[in-house]
Structures are given as structure tokens and as C-alpha cells.
Swiss-Prot record:
Purpose of the protein: One of the essential components for the initiation of protein synthesis. Protects formylmethionyl-tRNA from spontaneous hydrolysis and promotes its binding to the 30S ribosomal subunits. Also involved in the hydrolysis of GTP during the formation of the 70S ribosomal complex.
Cross-referenced CDD domains: IF2_eIF5B, IF2_mtIF2_II, mtIF2_IVc
Native source organism of the sequence: Campylobacter jejuni subsp. jejuni serotype O:2 (strain ATCC 700819 / NCTC 11168)
Cited Gene3D superfamilies: 1.10.10.2480, P-loop containing nucleotide triphosphate hydrolases, Translation factors, Translation initiation factor IF- 2, domain 3
Location (main, coarse): cytoplasm
Region entry G5, spans: 515-517
GO MF, one annotated term: GTPase activity
Region spans: G2: 404-408
GO cellular-component term (any): cytosol
Region (Disordered): 60-101
InterPro entries recorded: EF-G-like_DII, EFTu-like_2, IF2_II, IF2_N, P-loop_NTPase, Small_GTP-bd, T_Tr_GTP-bd_dom, TF_IF2_bacterial-like
Bias type Basic and acidic residues, positions: 73-101
Name this polypeptide is given: Translation initiation factor IF-2
Length: 871
């Protein structure tokens, strides 16, 4: 049999040759170089020693230094190995028997009393791979009861030193036994790492199930062993292939030799590489899964244990074209859960950075004080809302407004009878619906102003609906009572039809006749407001952290981002750290509506604050927090969340919408860059411009923002074809004008919303295809057809209606059906050419390209008129 060199063993095991030499010398082999060769049995022993870190039985006598004291190896185990060797090597049977007898005599002389204890230890020794697999397959385990009083002690003896390296046949284990023991040891070590084994080691010990046990005579009370099912064995687990991979150097050595420890020898390994077996992973059933309200496709797939492609294909089958980064709405999540058969629990991920939800209002009754009421004035445009507030404030706001209409939300403080009242003035124009809705949502009482001479108008109805939706009390102020055409009864009747019944008519709504010009009824109106506020019992805690609503925000030169706020709870002071949506910062300065500096704003009061990092959205809730770090974290999380959501929306489209998108691609668009002075006006303008569209044209707002027109806006406009820059209540500076002139960018600025919308409508109308209409000119009857050589047919006609013009478009009509359309090629009156022939005259008409004229046909003359389209 071929010997195996040390470097081959090192290569097979992936070790350095020096390490293999050291391990071999530890076994007493005396290896000096990597080229030294050893027998296959010794190579197998080295392999076992390196893998298990345990010295093989056959080499214990070869070690010169005394080993650590260990219990003596069992005699029964050696006998089993010898018996197995006898079966597999019948030729060496006689020799093995003699050696077994000698070994037995030695064991009996050494210690005959240890036989019983050795049998007990035998149960703990590593079993062969076949035994372990079979016991696992049967699913049973023999449990040995614990007895604290019995402690098994094994006598130890010193191993005799031996200088001669002689490996007897009884000490040479077969390759199969060696590797089965080594593999079993590794397998046992791996099992010990698993968590479920730790709990079993406390009370049970596995016995050799293949040994002979009389299970029929087992008693649970008297006996030490109990047969129990082994729950660590899976029922569905299939027995794995017992064959283990052997080292290449063993296969090379015994490849051609039959009968070495195996019946029939070892089969030659095929050169063909075995096909890789793909282990089928057990699909775990997913129970109830927590899914965030806003989740991307790939995140949803990870949550439910599916591949992203599988989820996308399912969405495609449901009619949704998505990418893995798109967000899923609640309906899509529920449909997918039903398709995959998964129970889900939808949670709102935005709660993690919902600073409003985290805000804790202290409700200690001792700290609650009466706060100022917040009153919102609403109504139709030009019904006198701002004029009424001007009289109350003794100011002239209305006279300074562009176009005589309010285009911003204003907050003002008024003191009446030593009590403060906060007023919010909202625009009445239809474009400012969102502003009115915000005003109604943060107010305590709503005053609806109706002109006595004009009655209920569309925005009046809308304001009433906003107030009802907010659930706040309504007071009706009938304005312009000083006019001769004033008719308050008409107003009451119209409002009664909307279920706004006056108190004097048996209803529950207060009606007050006022005049913003003369001051009539103003005192009565304020008295009713304070009375209503007392009924509501408006209270707040001024000692807690501030909570306020932003009703308007803008950028002011020299001050940066400013915001008009109304404090709802707590006290907002200079130096407070605040967060509002994506904006955060420390309040650097505060002022009232008159521009007077303030140190604090109490509940129910309004003011203007400076110090935010950016322009906050109108309608956001502003909260005071403890630290700047906390405010920054809230704002950054909100910014990232909104950004990801916006990016996702730009890509998501359903199959049903795809056709509309393709059709929309044929639309002509007017690219617009929109800048305004405040956030509320910008919001209103965007909403109004987006409504200016039809099947042919639309407005495309490529950028919008609060503040003045900058050079970056000009650069963006120059990069976009045919785009214009629209400014509302702002003016470009000299540098910006020069840059726009150089780039050929047109800038238009306005201070009245009517004018801006009208100009955009005109621009859109110029881009639309003109409307083509027909204008009938005349009609002639053909009475004779003359064929002229080289020219064709000439029709002799009588003009019966209007005139026939040379070069005009004509239709040839036969029996009421148009048979030809073309142009007049020649027109003559007798022999002379004519430009036109009027009704009642005869003429000769030549039609270009027509040779099928008949007597009795009619020639109809017309012209096409183009009209400019408008929205």
C-alpha cells in the first residue's frame, strides 16, 4: 500500500507542513521533514488528532511524557472494534483472536473490579455514525435518572512509556471506524452549541439506544433508565446520507486496494464532479406582521419574507406599475396581504417624528388661566371684512391693500374692556380657500361678514361650510347698513335657507347689523364676542411648553424667515427652541402686529417670530422643545420622510393612468417659475394656476418659492424652453434684471391676483390652436357646362346668393351632397376677368382640378376665419 507524505496531509487539511510535523511529533512519530512518508493508518490517526484534539488510543503508549490523568478506555469498546474488524477482514481472523485473548488477560490482571463502572462510562462514549443516525431516526432517547449520592469514580493509571514505535493490528483501527469516531466527535461539538441542548443537559443524558436493553421490564420508580421520546428530532427530517467526505490522501492510498476495512473494497471516484445539491429551505409561515403606513415595495417584501420581484409581479398583475423604491398605500398593502395570505397590522411610521403627538399638555387645574379668544373674520370678497377690522383697530389696513382686496392672512390684537381679543383677517377671493380653511380650524369664534346690499355670495357659503366643519360658533355681521340699498331681511332670509336661523326668528345664531364706515353696531358686536368667549370657558396653561399655529410665513430682507403665530397653549418666549415641520431654530426676536418688540406671547395672543431655519408651511403646528438637538432631529426626520415620499410619487403610475400620461405628453405646457412674498399667497396662486388647463394646454410650475427673484431662478428659466418668471408682491433687483435680459428670460410681477391670472390665461390662449370657422360668401347654379381644349370644363352659372370671388374656396354640391372641394381657378363676366360676381349676374367659373361638373349642380363659395382660442 502506498505511503502518504506529510506535505500531502498538510495540503488536504489546509495546514502548514510545520504544524502537521509538530502534531505528528506530539504523537511520538519522530517526523523531521515534510517529505517523510507514513502509512495510511498513521495518516488517518494524524487526521483524527488534528480534527478532534484527542490522542488516538493506538498512540497513547508511544508518548514519552506522562499524559494528563484520564479514565481507562473501556474493554467492551475495544472488543466491539475488534469484532467489527474480524467481520471485515476474514483473512486475519485467527491472528486477531489471539491478540484479543492477550488483551483480555492484561485487562483482567490490571483491575477486575472496574468492569461495572466501565460499562456505565461506555454509554457516554462517542457512537459510530450509523448508531447516532439510527437513534436519531427512531426518535427515542434512554434517560438516566440522576442520583446525587452516586458519584462514579474511575481509577486512573499511568501510561507506560515505550520507545519502540510498534503498531499492532488490534491497535490499528479501521479507516471507517477512525473517521466515524472523528466525524461523530465534530458532530457532537456542533450540537453542543445549539441552544436547545442546554436545557436538556440539566435533567437528561442520552444512552446508547443500539445496546441491548429490555424495555419490557423497565420500571419508572425502581429503575435508573426511562425510555422517552426525543423531541429534538424533527418528524419531517429525512435521514441524511451517511457517507462522509474522506481526505483525498486516504482515497488515493486505498483507491485500488480491496478489502482494507471494507467489503468489496472502495469504489474509484469518478472524475465527473457531482452535481450540487440545493438544500430546500423550509418556508416559515409568517404570522401577523407590523407594516408601516408608508412603506416601500422592497421593505414590504422583506417584512413578509418574499422576494421583491415576486411582490412587483403581483402588483403588476393587479394593474400597478411600481419600482422597488415606490411607496405602497394602505389599499395596496391590504390587497397584497390578502393575495399572500398574511395577516398584517398597519402602523404609522410618521409617529416616530410626530412632535405634536409627543407634546404633553399639563392639565393641572391650578395652572389653567383664562386666555384671549381667537376670532376669524370671513366672508365674500369686497363685503368689508378688513374695513370692519380697521374700525375696531382704529387703523387703515384696507386702504393700503393692492386692488382693494386682502391677499394675506393677518393677525391682530385688540383690547376691549381690559380683555384682549385676537382677530384673524382672511382673504375673500376664491383663490384663497386654503387660507380660509386654516383660519377656521385654529379659531374659537367665526364672524361671517355679509354685505346688506349684496346678500349671500359663493364665498359666503364656503366660509359658513368651513366654520361648520371646524365646529366653531358663528356670529353673522351684516355690514354696510349705512347704505340706502341695505336690506338686512334679505340677508336673514338667504341665510335661513342655509339653516343659519337668527335668534329673533327662533334660531341660535346671533345677527348684528354694523357699519364699518360709521361704526354703527361695532360695540354690540364686541360685546357678543366676549359673551360667547365666556360661554366657551377658554383656558390654557401658560407655564407649559409653548404650542402655536403658524398662520402665515415669509422671508423678510435683513430678518430671514419670519412666521406669524397664534399661541394655543404655554408661553412662547425669546430664546425658546422651536420646531415647525421641516423648520426649526431658536426664537431670536418677537413683535406684535404694530411692530412693537415682545418678550413673550401668552396663550390666545398672536405675534411675529424670527429665527426659524427656513420658511415654515402655513398651517403647521409650532412646538417649543427642550434642546436644539431634539428640534433638529424632528425637522431632519420630517425632511427625509417628505423627500422620500416625493421621490416615490414621481415614479408611481398605474396601468389605467399610463394611457392618460401618454395622452398628457401631447399637451402643450407653459413652464412657469412662481415666486411670492408669503407662503399663503404662493399656495393660493399654485392652486389657481393648476386649474388653468384643458385638453390642449396646461401650466407647468417647474419651481416655486417664497422670497425675491434670484439669479438661480433666472438660470432655471433659461434652461427651460419658453418659460417665464412670475412674481407676486415682489420686484427683481438690478442684477437680476440684467441677468434676465442677457439670458432672454421674461419676468412679470403683479400685486393683484386678478391681473396675474388674466395674463396667464391670455398666454395660454396664444399657445392654443386657433378656432377655425367658416364664413359663407355666396352660391351659384350651373346652367351650362362648356368644354374648353387644354383648359377643361367651364361652368356657366347664375349667382343666386351672395357673391362668388376669384381664389375663394368652393364646394360642388349635387343633389345636396358635396362631390368636390377646391378653389376657383378662373372667374369671368362675359369675356372679361372679374374679381367677384354679385347676386343676379351670370358668370363663367373654372374649378381647379374638377372635370365632373353637370348642369343643375350648385357651387358654394366660402372662406375660413381663424379665431384666437381662450380658456
Amino acid at each position: 500500500m502506498a505511503k502518504i507524505r506529510i506535505h500531502e496531509i498538510a495540503k488536504e487539511l489546509g495546514y502548514d507542513s510545520k504544524e502537521i510535523i509538530e502534531k505528528a511529533n506530539e504523537l511520538g512519530l519522530g517526523i523531521k521533514t515534510a517529505s517523510n512518508a507514513v502509512e495510511p493508518e498513521i495518516a488517518a490517526a494524524i487526521y483524527e488528532y488534528i480534527q478532534t484534539r484527542e490522542i488516538p488510543e493506538a498512540f497513547k503508549k508511544n508518548i514519552k511524557t506522562p499524559t494528563a490523568k484520564k479514565p481507562k478506555k473501556e474493554n467492551i469498546k475495544e472488543q466491539e472494534k475488534l469484532n467489527e474488524s474480524e467481520k471485515k477482514e476474514p483473512k486475519k481472523e485467527e491472528k486477531l483472536k489471539q491478540e484479543v485473548k492477550k488483551e483480555e488477560l492484561k485487562i483482567e490482571k490490571e483491575n477486575a473490579k472496574e468492569e461495572e463502572k466501565q460499562e456505565i462510562i461506555d454509554a457516554h462514549k462517542p457512537q459510530s455514525l450509523a448508531s447516532a443516525t439510527l437513534a436519531k431516526r427512531r426518535g427515542l432517547v434512554i434517560v438516566k435518572k440522576k442520583k446525587d449520592e452516586e458519584e462514579i469514580q474511575v481509577k486512573k493509571e499511568e501510561v507506560k512509556n515505550s520507545n519502540d514505535i510498534s503498531i499492532n493490528n488490534e491497535e490499528r483501527l479501521s479507516l471507517k471506524t477512525m473517521f466515524s469516531n472523528a466525524d461523530e466527535s465534530l458532530k457532537k461539538k456542533k450540537k453542543e452549541k445549539k441552544s436547545f441542548v442546554a436545557s436538556k443537559k440539566e435533567s437528561t443524558e442520552k444512552m446508547n439506544f443500539l445496546d441491548e436493553h429490555d424495555f419490557g421490564d423497565i420500571s419508572l420508580d425502581d429503575e435508573d433508565e426511562v425510555v422517552l421520546p426525543d423531541f429534538s428530532v424533527k418528524e419531517q427530517e429525512k435521514p441524511q446520507n451517511i457517507n462522509k467526505k474522506q481526505p483525498n490522501f486516504i482515497r488515493q492510498a486505498v483507491g485500488n486496494s480491496a478489502g482494507f476495512g471494507f467489503e468489496g473494497g472502495i469504489q474509484r471516484r469518478s472524475r465527473k464532479k457531482p452535481s450540487k445539491k440545493i438544500e430546500k429551505k423550509e418556508v416559515e409561515e409568517v404570522g401577523s406582521v407590523a407594516i408601516s403606513k408608508e412603506i416601500r415595495v422592497y421593505e414590504f417584501a422583506d417584512k413578509i419574507g418574499k422576494s421583491t420581484s415576486e411582490v412587483i409581479s403581483k402588483l403588476f398583475m393587479l394593474g400597478m406599475m411600481t419600482t422597488k423604491n415606490d411607496f405602497l398605500d394602505e389599499d395596496a398593502i391590504e390587497i397584497l396581504a390578502a393575495e399572500f395570505g398574511i395577516e398584517i397590522n398597519i402602523i404609522n411610521e410618521a409617529d416616530e417624528f410626530d412632535y405634536v403627538k409627543d407634546y404633553e399638555e399639563e392639565t393641572d387645574e391650578k395652572d389653567l388661566v383664562t386666555r384671549a379668544p381667537v376670532i376669524t373674520i370671513m366672508g365674500h370678497v369686497d363685503h368689508g371684512k378688513t374695513s370692519l377690522l380697521d374700525y375696531i383697530r382704529k387703523s387703515r389696513v384696507a386702504s393700503g391693500e393692492a386692488g382693494g382686496i386682502t391677499q394675506h392672512v393677518g393677525a391682530y390684537m385688540v383690547e376691549k374692556n381690559g380683555r384682549k381679543i385676537t382677530f384673524i383677517d382672511t382673504p375673500g377671493h376664491e383663490a384663497f380657500t386654503a387660507m380660509r380653511a386654516r383660519g377656521a380650524s385654529i379659531t374659537d369664534i367665526v364672524i361671517i361678514v355679509v354685505a346688506a346690499d349684496d346678500g349671500v355670495k359663493p364665498q359666503t357659503k364656503e366660509a359658513i361650510n368651513h366654520a361648520k366643519a371646524a365646529g366653531v360658533p358663528i356670529i353673522i355681521a351684516i355690514n354696510k347698513m349705512d347704505k340706502e340699498a341695505a336690506n338686512p331681511d334679505m340677508v336673514k332670509t338667504q341665510l335661513a335657507e342655509m339653516e343659519i336661523m337668527p335668534v329673533e326668528w327662533g334660531g341660535s345664531y346671533e345677527f348684528v347689523g354694523v357699519s364699518a364706515k360709521t361704526g354703527m353696531g361695532i360695540e354690540d358686536l364686541l360685546e357678543i364676542v366676549l359673551l360667547q368667549a365666556d360661554i366657551l370657558e377658554l383656558k390654557a396653561n401658560p407655564k407649559s411648553f409653548a404650542k402655536a399655529s403658524i398662520i402665515e410665513s415669509s422671508v423678510q430682507k435683513g430678518r430671514g424667515a419670519v412666521a406669524t403665530v397664534i399661541v394655543q397653549n404655554g408661553t412662547l418666549t425669546v430664546g425658546s427652541t422651536v420646531v415647525a415641520g421641516e423648520a426649526y431654530g431658536k426664537v431670536r426676536a418677537m413683535s406684535d402686529d404694530q411692530g412693537k418688540a415682545l418678550k413673550e406671547i401668552k396663550p390666545g395672543e398672536c405675534g411675529v417670530i424670527v429665527g426659524l431655519s427656513e420658511v415654515a408651511d402655513a398651517g403647521e403646528i409650532l412646538i417649543a422643545v427642550k434642546t436644539d438637538k431634539e428640534a433638529r432631529e424632528y425637522a431632519n426626520k420630517r425632511h427625509e420622510y417628505n423627500r422620500q415620499k416625493e421621490l416615490s410619487k414621481s415614479t408611481k403610475v398605474s396601468i389605467d393612468e399610463l394611457g392618460a400620461k401618454i395622452k398628457e405628453g401631447n399637451l402643450k405646457a407653459l413652464p412657469v417659475i412662481l415666486k411670492a412674498d408669503v407662503q399663503g399667497s404662493l399656495e393660493a396662486l399654485k392652486a389657481s394656476l393648476e386649474k388653468l388647463r384643458n385638453d390642449e394646454i396646461k401650466v407647468n410650475i417647474i419651481h416655486s418659492g417664497v422670497g425675491g427673484i434670484t439669479q438661480s431662478d433666472i438660470e432655471l428659466a433659461s434652461a427651460s424652453e419658453n418659460s417665464i418668471v412670475l412674481g407676486f408682491n415682489i420686484r427683481p433687483t438690478g442684477e437680476v434684471k440684467e441677468r434676465a435680459k442677457d439670458k432672454g428670460v421674461e419676468i412679470k410681477t403683479y400685486n393683484v391676483i386678478y391681473n396675474l391670472l388674466d395674463d396667464v390665461k391670455a398666454l395660454l390662449g396664444g399657445m392654443m390652436s386657433p378656432i377655425i370657422s367658416e364664413e359663407q360668401l355666396g352660391q351659384a347654379e350651373i346652367r351650362q357646362v362648356i368644354n374648353v381644349p387644354k383648359i377643361g370644363q367651364i361652368a356657366g352659372c347664375m349667382v343666386t346668393e351672395g357673391v362668388i370671388n376669384r381664389g375663394a374656396k368652393i364646394r360642388l354640391i349635387r343633389d345636396g351632397v358635396v362631390v368636390y372641394e377646391g378653389n376657383v381657378s378662373s372667374l369671368k363676366r362675359f369675356k372679361d376677368d372679374a374679381k367677384e360676381v354679385a347676386k343676379g349676374y351670370e358668370c363663367g367659373v373654372g374649378i381647379e382640378g374638377c372635370d365632373d361638373m353637370r348642369v343643375g349642380d350648385y357651387i358654394e363659395s366660402y372662406k375660413e376665419v381663424e379665431e384666437q382660442a381662450s380658456l
